[in-house]
Amino acid sequence: MSRSGDRTSTFDPSHSDNLLHGLNLLWRKQLFCDVTLTAQGQQFHCHKAVLASCSQYFRSLFSSHPPLGGGVGGQDGLGAPKDQQQPPQQQPSQQQQPPPQEEPGTPSSSPDDKLLTSPRAINNLVLQGCSSIGLRLVLEYLYTANVTLSLDTVEEVLSVSKILHIPQVTKLCVQFLNDQISVQNYKQVCKIAALHGLEETKKLANKYLVEDVLLLNFEEMRALLDSLPPPVESELALFQMSVLWLEHDRETRMQYAPDLMKRLRFALIPAPELVERVQSVDFMRTDPVCQKLLLDAMNYHLMPFRQHCRQSLASRIRSNKKMLLLVGGLPPGPDRLPSNLVQYYDDEKKTWKILTIMPYNSAHHCVVEVENFLFVLGGEDQWNPNGKHSTNFVSRYDPRFNSWIQLPPMQERRASFYACRLDKHLYVIGGRNETGYLSSVECYNLETNEWRYVSSLPQPLAAHAGAVHNGKIYISGGVHNGEYVPWLYCYDPVMDVWARKQDMNTKRAIHTLAVMNDRLYAIGGNHLKGFSHLDVMLVECYDPKGDQWNILQTPILEGRSGPGCAVLDDSIYLVGGYSWSMGAYKSSTICYCPEKGTWTELEGDVAEPLAGPACVTVILPSCVPYNK
C-alpha cells in the first residue's frame, strides 16, 4: 500500500493469478474466442489478446493488419487466412490489376481467379510448420503458466515456441533438457539440441558421449566413425571427438591417427573451420596421410562450381536414407506470388517441414538432382498466363551446408518445361515465355559450366511431362499452340535426334511422367472439352520396348494438375497440384505403388496448397537445420 496525499494505491497480489484463471476458464469453455488457429488440421479457438501479449509473432501479425484486411503473412510465412493463404515473405502489396484473360488451352496449373478478393477479418490462421501437439502444449502454457514436457514432446514444443517467438517457453524447454540429461538419453538430447542450436545443452549432452568414447578400443572407435547415422551432429564434432580419443592416450593411440582420419569426411567441414579447427591440430600438419586429406578438402571448397563433379566418400552426407523434397509452387490468392519454400517430408513424424528458402520465388520450374545437389531451373517468379514473368535462373542448393549458389542462366527464359540429367549434362526442353511456346532444347555441361543448343523438339510444346529411361529422354503430352496433345517423343542424345513414338490414349497436359520397372507412367493433368478443363483420371503405362500404351485399372485418387512428382523406393509420389473437379489447390500427398496397383494418401500436408511445385528426392543430414 502507498499513500499520496489523500489517495491510496493498494496492490492485490492475487489479481494476476485470478486474471489468468479467468482467461483459462473462458478458453476452456470457448467463450469470447476471436481467432482460430489450425495446426496439422486441428483447430484451437483462442483470444487474440492472450496470443499477442505472449507472442511477438502474433503481436506483429495482429498490429500490422487491421481487423479488416487482405491476406495475412508473417516473417516466417506461417499465418494466413485458411481460405486465402499467401506465400511466405510476401513483398509489399501493390494495387491489384485484373488478371489477363486466359485463352483456352493455355498451360496453367491454376483456374480462373474466383478466390476471395473482398476484405475479411483475420480470425482463421493456419500455422504452417507447427505441430498440433506442440501448439496445444504452448497454448496450455499461455493460459495456465504451466507446460507439460517429456522427451517425446519437448522438441515439438520447442519448435513451436521458436516459430511463434515465445522466449519464455523456449527457456523452459532448454531448462527441461538440461535437467533431464542422463547416460540413458544423452544421444536423444544431443540431437534435439543440435536441431535447434542449443549450444549449452549440446555441451552438457556431449560430456556423456565423450566419457563413453574415451573408453573405446581402436576397433570400436573405428566402427563408431563408420556408423550411420553418426553419433554427433556434424563432421567437425566427429573430428574433435576423434582428437580427444587420440589425445587421451597419445603415446599408444597416435599410431592410429591416419587410419581414423581416413574415415572422416573432411569436405563436409566448412573451409573456415578446416583452417581454424582442423589445420591447427599438430598431426594434421605433420602426418603425410592427414596432410593429403586436409589438402583434398581445401581444394574441394576452392572450386564450388565443380563440386557436383568432384564427389567422393569425403563429401558424401552420412546417411543412406533418401527423402522427399518439395520446391516452390503457386499458392491460391489474388496476387498469385509463388512460394520460395523448400520443404521435406519427415517420414518418422509423418509431417512436412520447412528445410530452407530459395533465393527467389518460383513456380512451374524444374528441379534436377545431381550427386545430391539440387539444380533449380527456370520457372516464373509471378503468375502470368502468357509467360510474361518466365525466368532463365539456375541455382544450385547444397544440403551439406544448407547453401545456394547461382549458376550460368539458361539462354532462354522458360516456364512449364521439362529438365533432366543424362550423364554429364542437364537438358531443358520446350516450355513457354513471353514469346509463346518453345521448341528449343538446351544442354548444360556440368563440368565446363556452359550452355549450348541441341536439336529442337519437332513442335513447340509447353506443360508437357518428361522422363529418362535407358539413356534417352521421353516427352509426353502438353500444349501445342493452344491445343492439348497426346504425343510422345523420344530424344537420343548420342545421335542428337528426336523420334515420334506411339501417342498416349488420352490428350493431357500439366501432368507427370514417372519411370519404374522399365515402364513409363503418365499420371494426372487435364484436358479441354469445349472451353472446360477436365481432370484426367486415367493412368497410362508405356512399354518402351513394345512402343505400346496401356490404361491401368486403377485411376488416380483425385484430379491433379501441376503436382510435384518424384519416385521413392517402390512408389510414385504426387504432391500438391490443382483439382479442376473440386475447384481447389491441394496440399496433400498421394502415392501410387505400381507393383500393388494401389493408391494411398500420406499423413501430413505441405505448408500451403500449391500448384506448379517441383519434387525431387535427396539425402539430407541426420540433423536437418529446419525452421532456424
From Swiss-Prot:
Kelch repeats lie at residues 323-372, 373-424, 425-471, 473-518, 520-570, 572-620. Residues 33-151 form the BTB domain. Gene3D superfamilies: 1.25.40.420, Kelch-type beta propeller (2.120.10.80), Potassium Channel Kv1.1, Chain A (3.30.710.10). Residues 69-115 are annotated as: Disordered. Residues 210-279 form the BACK domain. Its main location: cytoplasm. GO terms for cellular component: actin cytoskeleton; aggresome; cytosol; endoplasmic reticulum; endoplasmic reticulum membrane; neuron projection; neuronal cell body. Residues 84-96 have a biased composition (Low complexity). PANTHER family: KELCH-LIKE PROTEIN 14 (PTHR45632:SF6), LD33804P (PTHR45632). Interacts with TOR1A, preferentially with the ATP-free form. This is Kelch-like protein 14. It comes from Homo sapiens. The gene is KLHL14.
